[in-house]
Amino acid sequence: MKNSTAASSRWTKSRLSHFFPSYTNSSGMGAASTDQSSTQGEELHHRKHCEEDNDGQKPKKSPVSTSTMQIKSRQDEDEDDGRIVIKPVNDEDDTSVIITFNQSISPFIITLTFVASISGFMFGYDTGYISSALISINRDLDNKVLTYGEKELITAATSLGALITSVGAGTAADVFGRRPCLMFSNLMFLIGAILQITAHKFWQMAAGRLIMGFGVGIGSLISPLFISEIAPKMIRGRLTVINSLWLTGGQLIAYGCGAGLNHVKNGWRILVGLSLIPTVLQFSFFCFLPDTPRYYVMKGDLKRAKMVLKRSYVNTEDEIIDQKVEELSSLNQSIPGKNPITKFWNMVKELHTVPSNFRALIIGCGLQAIQQFTGWNSLMYFSGTIFETVGFKNSSAVSIIVSGTNFVFTLIAFFCIDKIGRRYILLIGLPGMTVALVICAIAFHFLGIKFNGADAVVASDGFSSWGIVIIVFIIVYAAFYALGIGTVPWQQSELFPQNVRGVGTSYATATNWAGSLVIASTFLTMLQNITPTGTFSFFAGVACLSTIFCYFCYPELSGLELEEVQTILKDGFNIKASKALAKKRKQQVAEGAAHHKLKFEPTQEIVES
């Protein structure tokens, strides 16, 4: 083992000498001096802080606490190219390999990202079409108008189904694969849609929504996970946001189709039927596309893992690909347990007993809960009902404006999330949402809405200028939501180390769907019992408290490596330390990008051992 490690070190240093003439390893020993040429190809750092010396003795380790965490820049009297070496952040011998692919994103990665993001589109289309369908169903189910309670049950059925499957989706993805799980979610969408299209009874419609919810729960968890595992770290945040873009795009298209089919007989059935198109497309594409390299390594299929990496990074040498696969294999073996069940329970234990993991869980679940209990999904599910209530005849047209705003500001978040930072856009978005919700609550008070019994017929004083105020500030609310809390929670995979990531993201996603279930099944009841003013005041209060939570508990993670995230959370939330570190990392990344003229900002990829 010693000879193998030494040989690996010599090979790594020789490769670095070729690519980076002024390379110095992380312990400050051994600089290679050749010509000053640089490349835009692949970058491989082999960190050897604890490498055995000539006498066979290991040097003393220097664990780095959060307060003393440093980023050590290479020192060279002649030239400083801006690259950095991360010191070890744990008490283990650090023999990890750092691999960065400094090149343009390949068409293969773009293809995988967009195909996986179709799940986000289906998720968004589901939340969008039901709003229009609830308005146009009329007496098509059981030959009677749906009550508020029945509307809530139809809507909440999807959230219940998503909650059930999201709990075990992470483990299923480890056992069966990410791609098969997404294809299974397509089958659930297919069955659920067919049941709804042919429904003439309330129970069949609810059953179809429940089964479709199974697919939504799987897709909402696996799609971001799939993208994060195939994306280069230098643009991982932005590629993950593409899933959110597809989600908001699905909502926008659903509202547009709903507006067009609003007065067509059985138009809501056509609206549901259109959801079959992306379902069939994703299933068909995945018949010809591979799974992620990490999954293939987990199953011991190293040949396929190498194949996917080669197609993803077309200009990368075979030696670097081989080294990457070896590190992924070593990481997989570091997860305790010999079978999936044992590994699952060990991961659950580590998630709750390791302080940094538990803080990550608090943040991940907290953000997903905030996303639901600030009321956005209730607006998406029942926007048609809300806008009819305030006097708008073509409520679907107004819903298009709201969902269009959501899409545009999600697109803005796509460009800002890695540059401005996750924490900053959250602390802009949540206060903005709070103000908008407070104004909506006040406007509802002066509008004077009166509910007429327990059915879906609402008596109001008619349209007034307060209705305009409500619409305007719901649009403002949508903009601030999309910019921050609508996007950041789905970056949850970066919070957790690899050995608990599947379980951690399952917990967080399940929290999202549990919140969605509660809101979807109680929103119309809240409107009746505590009035729209009370309902929107509740959402405003949650948004206000959420701002405080994010201010004190959400560190800045933009630009940080996975090891750095765990160090930040090791003995607290360490907001100041995270902001300082993120700022320094961004400066050094910018300097490195300017020096090497890269198309994308390079970010080192640290594979945890």
Swiss-Prot record:
Glycan attachment points: 394
Membrane topology term: Multi-pass membrane protein
Polar residues composition-biased segments: 25-41, 63-72
GO CC, alphabetical: cell periphery; fungal-type vacuole; membrane; plasma membrane
Record-linked SUPFAM superfamilies: MFS general substrate transporter
InterPro entries: MFS_dom, MFS_sugar_transport-like, MFS_trans_sf, Myo-inositol_Transporter, Sugar/inositol_transpt, Sugar_transporter_CS
Membrane-crossing segments per the record: 105-125, 153-173, 180-200, 210-230, 241-261, 270-290, 360-380, 397-417, 424-444, 466-486, 507-527, 534-554
Keyword hit for Cell membrane: yes
Subcellular location: Cell membrane
Keywords (A to Z) from UniProt: Cell membrane, Glycoprotein, Membrane, Transmembrane, Transmembrane helix, Transport
Spans within the Cytoplasmic topological domain: 1-104, 174-179, 231-240, 291-359, 418-423, 487-506, 555-609
Region (Disordered): 25-83
Listed GO biological process terms: myo-inositol import across plasma membrane; myo-inositol transport
GO molecular function, one term: myo-inositol transmembrane transporter activity
Catalytic activity: myo-inositol(out) + H(+)(out) = myo-inositol(in) + H(+)(in)
Superkingdom, natural source: Eukaryota
Function (record text): Minor transporter for myo-inositol.
Protein family per UniProt: Belongs to the major facilitator superfamily. Sugar transporter (TC 2.A.1.1) family.
Protein's name in the database: Myo-inositol transporter 2
Organism the protein comes from: Saccharomyces cerevisiae (strain ATCC 204508 / S288c)
Phylogenetic classification of the source organism: Eukaryota, Fungi, Dikarya, Ascomycota, Saccharomycotina
